[in-house]
Amino acid sequence: MPLNNPITSALLADPEIFQQNRLPFHAHFADQTSPEMLLTVSLDGEWNFRYAKNLTAPFTDWDTLTVPGFIQMQSLQKSGQPYGTPHYVNTQYPWDGHEKLRPGEIPQDYNPIGEYQRSFTLPESWASCYLRLNGADSAAAVWCNGVYIGYTEDTFTPAEFDMTAAVHPGENTLTVQVYRFSSGSWLEDQDFWRMSGLFRSVELFTKPELHLEDVFVKQDFAPDFSSATVTFDCKVSGAGTVSVVFNGQQQSAEVGEPAEYDSGVVFGKGEADPDVEEDVQDVSFTFAVTDPALWSAEQPNLYEAEIALLREGALVERTGLKVGLRKFELKDRQMLLNGQRIVFKGVNRHEWSCRTGRTVSREEMLWDVKNLKAHNVNAVRTSHYPDDPYFLQLCDEYGLYVIGETNLETHGTWQKLGADGSDEWTLPGARPEWRENVLARAEAMLERDKNHPAILIWSCGNESHGGKTLWEMSEYFRRTDPRRLVHYEGIFWNREYPATSDMESQMYPPVADIKKFLAEHPEKPFIMCEYSHAMGNSNGGITDYTEYAYEEPLYQGGFIWEYMDHGIAMTDPDGKPGFAYGGDFGDRPTDREFCVDGLVLPDRRNTPKMDAVKAAYAPLKITLTDTEAVIENRNLFTDLNAYDLVFASSVNGKPERRAVLRADCKPGETVHLLFPFALPETGLACMTVTAIQRAAKPGIPAGYEAAFGQVWHNYAAARLTLPAPQLVEMDCNIGVKGKGFEYIFGRGKGLVSIRYNGVQLLDDTVRPNFWRAPTNNDEGCAEPFAFAFWKTAGLYARCDNLTAEAKDEFVTVRANYTLPDGQTLPIDFAIDGAGRCDITMTWQGARTELPEFGLLFPLRRELTEVSYLGLGPRETTADRTAGGKMGAWSYNVRQDFAQNTPVYPQECGSRTGVYRAAVTGSGLNIGIGFAGDSMTFSALPYTPHELENARHLYELPRDDNKTVVRCAAFQRGVGGDNSWGAKPHADDCFAVEKGTSFRFTIQK
């Protein structure tokens, strides 16, 4: 079918033509029905589809694609990937290096068009027909029966069009062309995969002659919150009765007089803007509420409201709303929710599904919300665009604070290779041709989402520098919706319009820098819209930030970057499932694995980083001494008596005694509770106090563990004295053996054999180890370069001398190692008659920092079952122990690695605070034990060097070749303040100096 008014490249590139015939923005109605007719028809499902490389290229033959969905994600599933592939870049634009372009220009050679087409039958009862595109990336044009309907940019807000004049009874043909690049692409330089398509639902809808066009629910409160007034500002078309029922009250009004109404239609250059008159009237209803049940993340109370439209007493249309009553304000330089100082314990959340891209199912959204609530997260920043309305509905219902962010990021127009390179091309600045395009994005978001109580703050976008247009946007927000605050981080880069943001917002500053800034600039509250970069094995030091929020009133929390890895599900060369990241589809330029930077893996499995988040964001801080628990209630509206406080003692991980207490403690206060019984004084004695939620809340069942605190002491057990083992000294080897054990040390090699009960446990020689597989954060601050010596030091340390001495009940073998720089490292192996081997390695050189200090044991492949006494149950690091609980834990080496390792291979799997560990195998009937004083322990299928050499998990060797155990005095913290230069905090950057020693024991 021929299409009139075809779209031209000039139109796509023109920032002043960003929509044509688009209907006015309005609130999203999740529940609008009519007894007379079906108001909405979904067009989701299979569409006919064809593809062209650019505007002048021929189209392919017709195929089918699914709506909603991305063209490139579905192309991956087709032979030859005929419709292109996803392309990942961070701040650089995807055309950088391919075509020389500036704002106002778009790619000409590669600007694919996806043409969707399907037929529909107009319901007989419909007197009007409208189309709603809920999300089209990056621009779309619509035709019905070949007649041009309209054009839209702004990927993440709905575009509605009136097709009434073009439809006819019976079957109609709808055509939508989606363009990968448009002028809007310059404004959508978010850190994500670049793709195109109809990625949110497509709907037809009709309007009854009496119709609710829009509603804005507004609230005001008495100073003590003892009462509230709730106003429903409605826009209604048609004549009849409007009835609003709220809080058991009902009000009604008659409408019917026509009024001039600005349609909001924006036309392209050269087109006249006709006068549009519709029978739309404004009508308001105000209700009084006594003792209102306020909305918060802790108590997401929602009232039901119903707006009914009637004609001659008969119901024509019904709209249901859920209303949350809450007051968010800036007072005395602090942000207050319902009168209380708020601390944002948040995450940034891109919309993502590893199989469908930014087309996220309702089930995935619900999982996200419940998962965030289960980890004490109370806030989400919709980075960096308006989310699907259903996600916001869930935030209302389950209780999450939201920063609603405008679909705007122009990072690549001003930041060049990490530095501020702003110039005349920086967008939006004060460039007049971009002004309306930018401001319309803010209007579309606010109008759609204005009735969500979860949204506390409007954000002007992300990383778009500064200037007058952004200030105008902030003023629009304040003028239209004064009951919310306005956020914009970019004033940090450009202070020309500081009033753009009601708060100081920065990204990734260390706590020390925040303290310094607030000491010098205490005018506004301070949040971090991004912090604790979660790329790879990260988020070290996160608790430092949370604790500061309770020390400095002006610092009110932040949002971790980010919630989820953006890996794409794929099948690896071995036929196994895996994940792809930037560059894996040949996409260039690319920022490679920078897209896998989340707290959860691409398939929504929680990483151990989430354990630390849950602990850092806990609503209670529980600190234990040897005799009492000190509990600080960090809730805003929940008393401590909402929790059962479980006191439990254990010895060596085995439960001893248990008691349940309850206590009153108001929000913001602290209580001291004496232990109901004494802490034991034997073995590894531990007292744990756990706060268990007594009643279910939305998303959180009764019995949920909200917080815990621990104290423990390790009491050494008496050691039996046995006769010394037998020493066997020969030309090539030294042996030490006794009943059920034998150790062999090779001259020039070191410890080469451990046999317990006749079973060989080693796969290779035990070696000193100073290296860990570099993490993304290590690479970002060039630590592999700085510490390169330590990689070779462990690999090539030479055992120059081996001596043995039998004395008292021990045989001690000393292995003297020489490192490549000539430094020496003696390691003593003191073996008693029971086969216990006390190992002591002592540093002899100058003071130096290094990644790790310990020994590496390559064990037989059968040894895969680990049980240990230490922090668990999952990985902890030197700077990420929060969330680790002292106790007895167990895991399978291969399963633990498969379930928890980052998409990009790097150091992982360590356990800190370990006192004892055992590694066994099902077929050997024997294992090897390790014991130390709060050491760092890991058991992996790979050496650090094997992990380092792989860029994807499928590039690693088979996982059943061996088990690599490492016992270390320390391993350097993983850091996480950012991933491009920040080192771990000073306390977590360990060093050795002359005399530093590490002692631990191995035994059967």
Explain the meaning of each model-derived region:
Residues 2-35, 73-76, 147, 186, ...:
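Extended substrate-binding grooves/exosites of carbohydrate-active enzymes
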Residues 82-87, 92-106, 153-155, 163, ...:
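An acidic-aromatic loop/edge-strand motif
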Residues 144, 227-270, 283, 305, ...:
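Beta-strand-rich binding/interaction modules
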